[in-house]
Amino acid sequence: SYKEGAEAVRWECDGSPEYSLEPTSKESRGTEIVLHINEESAEFLDTVRVESILNKFCRFLPVPIKYEDKQINNPTPAWTKKPSELTTEDYQNFYKELYPYNEPPLFWIHLNVDYPFNLTGILYFPKIKQSYEIQKDKIQLYCNQVFVTDEVKDIVPEFLMLLQGVIDSPDIPLNVSRSYLQGDPNVKKINNHITKKVADKLDEIFTKDRPEFEKKWD
């Protein structure tokens, strides 16, 4: 323990609702976890399967995560930084980190709100082809950099589901019904805020350089 003289503790559970806690001895600081896998869960001993799970759920955790001596996460992703600290290249590199096989995006918006709700994130507007099919799992929802879901249709307006990227908010209710989400005041505010930010960005591009704006839709 970080507290000098504190006693080490051993926690043990066989998978049932009950567990045991007992004093033990330990020289080094920190926690060691030994997980026993039964035959039915043998897939979780496969390196590719483990890396896939870690990449999905631990990709942007705010503390370094190592797997077999290799750090597998980015604890300081672009959306946690101020827009003034990022360059165009930074935004494009983060897009590649999220979608390594996609073409560069048309533009992006950086969300950074702390009142009346907390919301950070980066949303990208992808290149759209005539045969483009909207995929509704391209926006990832996080809560303090912990992955929650990629089902955000009740948080992001339906007509903006072509957007891609990340939103992070501790003010969005977790593990609740769709009807509850639709009635939550913070979700409504976040929904409206995202809509306005996209509209403002489109208006900005149109006003500053109409030929370039029109070229984006060719």
Regions of interest found by a model, annotated:
Residues 1-75, 143-146:
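GHKL-type ATPase core
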Residues 35-36, 141-149, 176-183:
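Glycine- and acidic
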Residues 215-218:
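A contiguous, basic/glycine-rich beta-loop/short-helix subdomain that forms a polymer-engagement track
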